[in-house]
Amino acid sequence: MKIAVIGCGRWGTFHAWYAARIGHDVMLWGRKNSPHLAQLRERRANEFLTLPEDIRLTDDIYEALYFAEIVIVSIHAQALRSFLKELCAQGLLENLLGKRLILCMKGLEIYTGKRLTTVVREELGDAVHPVVWVGPGHVQDFVRGIPNCMVIAGKDKEELRNLVEILSSPLIRFYYGEDL
């Protein structure tokens, strides 16, 4: 599958590395002024891992969204609402329609106390149905090959089963849940 990872910090870079490792076609997006993206373009590595050459790097959000069947969002939780507003202002909401949106961040919106799935619904409406990827783990452990279990949670059981099948591997065994 074609997977775009939005956010090229430690976890976003890991999600791109992991998706490529299990056979997916991956594009990793970062903002034009991102020091993380600059480092990845220069060395194809950060302090935790080296990206395979087949992962494409971009600072063009349209390109990343257009490319993807699955969009993994791994940005700071407090930046989610402004990022979604930016997408809508640029007319890019239609590029998310019909795609799987996976939130890989934790926490609540600090000023409202709202869950991140609620923030997505408020900003994008009911046309996009996000799921969340959560669980314990450290990038450095995964890169060393230490396996773990994680959860993908959402409302649609069939979609969750499908995502578990697409993303599970000997390194990460996924389970699904409905507790958002």
Residue ranges and their predicted role:
Residues 49-56, 97, 126-129, 170-172:
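A short helix-to-beta-strand connector/capping loop
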Residues 1-51, 55-59, 63:
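NAD(P)+-binding Rossmann beta1-loop-alpha1 motif at the extreme N-terminus of oxidoreductases
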Residues 136-144, 168-180:
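Conserved Rossmann-fold dehydrogenase catalytic segment
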Residues 147-174:
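Conserved anion/nucleotide-ligand pocket segment
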Residues 63-65, 70-147, 160-164:
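Rossmann-like NAD(P)(H) cofactor-binding subdomain of soluble oxidoreductases
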